């Protein structure tokens, strides 16, 4: 995996501008902050992020993948304000579960998610090396 950083661009904080990779592609559907029984256990934004990331890790593990194989994430949040207010705690949760691996990322505020109590949904793409 190669991180793509154009010359003279400032280094991004917490994500990469691009990733080049070869291997088996894994596409992970949007994961929300519910557990394996489809129950949201917390209304706290950071805790929903924690569970969504745990769900991504579980799907990856089903294909012998690891967090460092993630090349792209798209975060859908229902409140930009709540996302930004939780930024430090989200970063702590992210580093705890994913480590200091920062794939290409996008965050988008949406009007709502399909599950009423969900505050965040995260899609991921991973490449497991050949």
PLM feature spans:
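N-terminal presequence-like segments and the immediate start of the first folded domain
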Residues: 1-71, 77-130
